[in-house]
Amino acid sequence: MVSNKNLLPIIYIFFIILYFGDVAKSQYFPLDKGATCQKYRGDSPGIQLCDGFLSNPNSIYINSTSSQEAIQAQGNLVRQYINFYKSFESCKNPRTFALLCAFLFPECEKYTDPVSKVTYAYPILPCYNNCLNMTTSCQISTSRLSCATKYTFENISYSVFPKNTTTYQIDSLSYTNTCENTDLIANSQNTSIQQCFEPLVYHVSTDEIHDKSIGYIFPSTNTTCVVGCPAPLYYANQWRNIYRLSDVLSILSCILTLFLVITLGIINPKVSRFDKINVMLLSSIFLQAFSGALMTFNGTENTLCPEDGRFASYIDRMCVATGFLLHGSSLLVVQWWCVLSFEVWFTIFQVGKKQKDRFIYYLVASLIIAWIPPIVSISKNEYSGGPANPFCWLTTFNYRRFAFWLPMGIFLCLGGVFLILLMREIYVIVSGNVQSTKESRFKVLKMEAKPIISLIMYFSCLLYLFIYDQWINNHMHVYTDSIPSYALCLLTSTSTNDCLLKAPDITGLGYFIYSIRVFGVYAFIIYGISKKTLQIWKYNYFVVFIGQKIEQFTNATTTAKSSNSNNSSTTNNISVKASSNMEYETRQENENGDSQSVELDSNSDAL
């Protein structure tokens, strides 16, 4: 962490030596006839300095050897130090900043020599009493900063902070001007004080340990600024892209897995042993995706950053709910993936033998193993957001290790073993010499092709999640060690938005999000786009019933249109043939009666 004790002298040096030396030189006009009166250029974006704290921003004094940009950079540094540290809390008031700005950019006036007709620019310096009040409120001792400091040049001493007036030596003449009372500026301005520069957020802590536990992150000790949320690990647009990726995949996986659960588990007329396992795997994936969908509906950034400058913690219900759900469902996913890998391998290995239905044992064991760790974690207030987390997760590494990665790693290894055994069986099938056994096993292999593909796809995602998390934990010191450099960047950079902590590559984090949210999409590609799914929906009772209703409605509409057409034609015929005799009408009725008899006979045969 950055030491406040080491930084305090720097501030005083800036006040007394670095900038005072420049400005002191500039007030002796025989030495600086190139000084000018300029209009204040305005503060740097996101960094409040002197906007609203100048008596006359349209006319400020700038000497010939300096520039507004250079002076502003020094002023920003002093202002950053004052804002950053709690030791200067009493300095954060309009009077301090009015004095600072009157010193950095003194009001400029012009004087024209009546003899030489040369116009000179000269500054109106802040008064001694204003400086004295500032050192008192900031609790700065006179040994570090004396308001009686004088600058001597060519055997003439000038006060940096004049008590009443300043005499300017202009050629052979002298010109006297009253000092500027900066308290009048402070009392008349309505500008609110920017306590911390972005991306830091102002927060006065009375109990830093408690504040850290509820989501505040302090970049240094003895500071009133906390790290903004989202954390400055990536740029704002990069965080938005990460959140957008998570939202889209969560909603998509949620919808697709819900469709598959309904298809294979509810409307499926013949639920097989593998269908039961797949339904449980898909239900687990649905819960996993639903945890992300909850964040989406609540606003992902709002969930992870419930307050400005505070990351989500155990006191935020939505964060806790999504973390708890993600924890349990992820353990369910890896368990049912392991069960599926075992069942596929064992079915091919024991081809021709009747398999027992072990579903109820799998169900009871998986529920116990999956939900005990989350229950323990939630009782210990372990779920929270964090600087690098795109979702709410376990806070401490030990809980992540024993409550999640230990069971996850065990089932990942077991599933990997079954996957290797499955590959061996495939090799045996391909290279086997016994034709009958080869044909029967190849038939089973063809039937289990999709479960095999799904196992490989799930395994690749789960393995990446495991490797990435372990790598992050092993390199955490890289990010924490970058905090002092980050704090220094905030204090010295002209654009604080360019200051970032060291972070994992954004591509790796993006693929991490992809891997944890994409399971539902993979499942739909494998099981949703299939002949079996089409057949289940095609012959489903409700689909058939709705289809019949639509067909009846279509037929009725067609018949009605045909009847209307016939009636219209008959009406036209009557009007045209109104003079026809009764013999013709009788003959038409007889012909109609014969045709109706034929139609009835045909319907009877069909029935």
From Swiss-Prot:
InterPro entries: Frizzled_dom, Frizzled_dom_sf, GPCR_2-like_7TM, GPCR_Fz/Smo-like
Protein name according to UniProt: Frizzled and smoothened-like protein J
GO molecular function terms attached to this record: transmembrane signaling receptor activity
GO cellular-component term (any): membrane
PANTHER family linked to this entry: FRIZZLED AND SMOOTHENED-LIKE PROTEIN J, G-PROTEIN-COUPLED RECEPTOR GPCR FAMILY PROTEIN
Superkingdom: Eukaryota
Signal peptide: 1-26
Similarity section: Belongs to the G-protein coupled receptor Fz/Smo family.
Predominant localisation class: membrane
GO aspect biological process, one term: cell surface receptor signaling pathway
Glycosylation (residues): 63, 133, 155, 164, 190, 222, 298
Segments of this protein annotated with the region Disordered: 559-607
Residue spans of biased composition, Low complexity class: 559-575
Domain notes: Lys-Thr-X-X-X-Trp motif interacts with the PDZ domain of Dvl (Disheveled) family members and is involved in the activation of the Wnt/beta-catenin signaling pathway.
Ranges of the Extracellular topological domain: 27-247, 298-330, 380-401, 473-508
Ranges of Polar residues composition bias in the record: 593-607
Cysteine-cysteine disulfides: 37-108, 50-101, 127-179
Residue ranges annotated as Cytoplasmic topological domain: 269-276, 352-358, 423-451, 530-607
UniProtKB keywords: Disulfide bond, Glycoprotein, Membrane, Receptor, Signal, Transmembrane, Transmembrane helix
Locus of motif Lys-Thr-X-X-X-Trp motif, mediates interaction with the PDZ domain of Dvl family members: 532-537
Residue intervals passing through the bilayer: 248-268, 277-297, 331-351, 359-379, 402-422, 452-472, 509-529
Subcellular location: Membrane
